[in-house]
Amino acid sequence: MKSQSKRTSRLFVFVGVVVAIIIAVLSWRYFGTGSDNNTSGAQQSARGQDTSHGGRRNTPLAPVQAATATEQEVPRYLTGLGTVIAANTVTVTSRVDGELMALHFTEGQQVKAGDLLAEIDPRPYEVQLTQAQGQLAKDQATLDNARRDLARYQKLSKTGLISQQELDTQSSLVRQSEGSVKADQGAIDSAKLQLTYSRITAPISGRVGLKQVDVGNYITSGTATPIVVITQTHPVDVVFTLPESDIPAIMQAQKNAEKTHAIVPVEAWDRTNKQMLAQGYLLSIDNQIDTTTGTIKLKARFNNEDDVLFPNQFVNARIKVDLLQNAVVVPTAAVQMGSEGNFVWTLDDANRVSKHLVTTGIQDSQQVVIDAGLNAGQRVVTDGIDRLTEGVQVEVVTPRSANTDTNPASAEKAAAEAEGSTPHQGRGRPANAPARSTTAAEKS
């Protein structure tokens, strides 16, 4: 009986201890958290009061870069893909048969019209010339003898010593000999021409390509294999295409140029469209549109004195068709695309931003023409746009120089100033903790 009473007493003690612990924990959590919350609330209230008095003055303004819209003369260009072609291309072949004796050019060199390029063995044609000259001498002697006989027959015919038939026969012999002499002269001229053809000269000025036949080979006239190909690159042409919708602008540019006896300028740019290679002028326009692509071909001519353009080279051709006067121009970075269309952020005298919808015109990688929505002299934001909202005040800063950007200490100092002198990560607050302004109460 006593043992059971002891067990019951111990159970009550254990339960009491557990209940006391639970009550203590609940009391601590309730009263301790409330105290902390009250303290935090008081601190936040104090900070709020301090902020209402002077915190706004310490909030940093968003830094932006700005530019002023200006009025300029802006040329209007049409750009098309083009290929460089030689102004003239000649495939040099032999017009006579024979062994190739010599080549008188270096592959890739510039030659002038009339320069000796190659020689075919001339000996067979020299022999033919000698034979033709010998036959001419023989027939010429026969002709001379026939003419003397004809003169005698004419005298005898007057005295009646020979018949008229004999006189006519002699006259025919003279004419026959004259024909033989003319044929011989033709044979001589042909032999001389063949001998001339054995010396192959450049028909045009230009650049020779790689040789196609080596010395020692037997060449026949009319063969498909040329000796060399010459391309005229001074000047050189560029054939490019433009959409058919651009034809009116091109034709108007041509008419304007004809009125002033000027040319329509054309520029050739490299494959990446970053470097201008040469300047030329519009030479001609094709007389029909390609129905497959809906484009028209144009040809431009370039002097190419510095040999920057090579046949079959790919280029971007830019043709100037107009010059806009007093066009409002801003940097391309200032124009943004939104759901309502293109817009820019403008700045007033107090550096407050305002969103303006604009209509853009001609543009490139550096600047864009504003057709409507902006006036010359207005300032527009070019950098820092992602932090802007309507009516917010900003700080206009100038771009740092390359020297400043490459100096780590200067860059860190500038970043700290732009963030309102907030501490560097790891020097007073965790990396993910938000920055806050220093209040007057905390300073005191």
Swiss-Prot record:
<keyword id="KW-0472">Membrane</keyword>
<feature type="region of interest" description="Disordered">
    <location>
        <begin position="37"/>
        <end position="60"/>
    </location>
</feature>
<feature type="compositionally biased region" description="Polar residues">
    <location>
        <begin position="435"/>
        <end position="444"/>
    </location>
</feature>
<keyword id="KW-0997">Cell inner membrane</keyword>
<dbReference type="InterPro" id="IPR006143">
    <property type="entry name" value="RND_pump_MFP"/>
</dbReference>
<dbReference type="GO" id="GO:1990281">
    <property type="term" value="C:efflux pump complex"/>
</dbReference>
<keyword id="KW-0813">Transport</keyword>
<keyword id="KW-0732">Signal</keyword>
<keyword id="KW-1003">Cell membrane</keyword>
<feature type="region of interest" description="Disordered">
    <location>
        <begin position="399"/>
        <end position="444"/>
    </location>
</feature>
<dbReference type="Pfam" id="PF16576">
    <property type="entry name" value="HlyD_D23"/>
</dbReference>
<protein>
    <recommendedName>
        <fullName>Multidrug resistance protein MdtA</fullName>
    </recommendedName>
</protein>
<feature type="compositionally biased region" description="Polar residues">
    <location>
        <begin position="37"/>
        <end position="52"/>
    </location>
</feature>
<dbReference type="InterPro" id="IPR032317">
    <property type="entry name" value="CusB_D23"/>
</dbReference>
<feature type="compositionally biased region" description="Low complexity">
    <location>
        <begin position="409"/>
        <end position="419"/>
    </location>
</feature>
<comment type="subunit">
    <text>Part of a tripartite efflux system composed of MdtA, MdtB and MdtC.</text>
</comment>
<dbReference type="GO" id="GO:0005886">
    <property type="term" value="C:plasma membrane"/>
</dbReference>
<comment type="similarity">
    <text>Belongs to the membrane fusion protein (MFP) (TC 8.A.1) family.</text>
</comment>
<dbReference type="InterPro" id="IPR022824">
    <property type="entry name" value="Multidrug-R_MdtA"/>
</dbReference>
<keyword id="KW-0677">Repeat</keyword>
<dbReference type="GO" id="GO:0015562">
    <property type="term" value="F:efflux transmembrane transporter activity"/>
</dbReference>
<feature type="signal peptide">
    <location>
        <begin position="1"/>
        <end position="20"/>
    </location>
</feature>
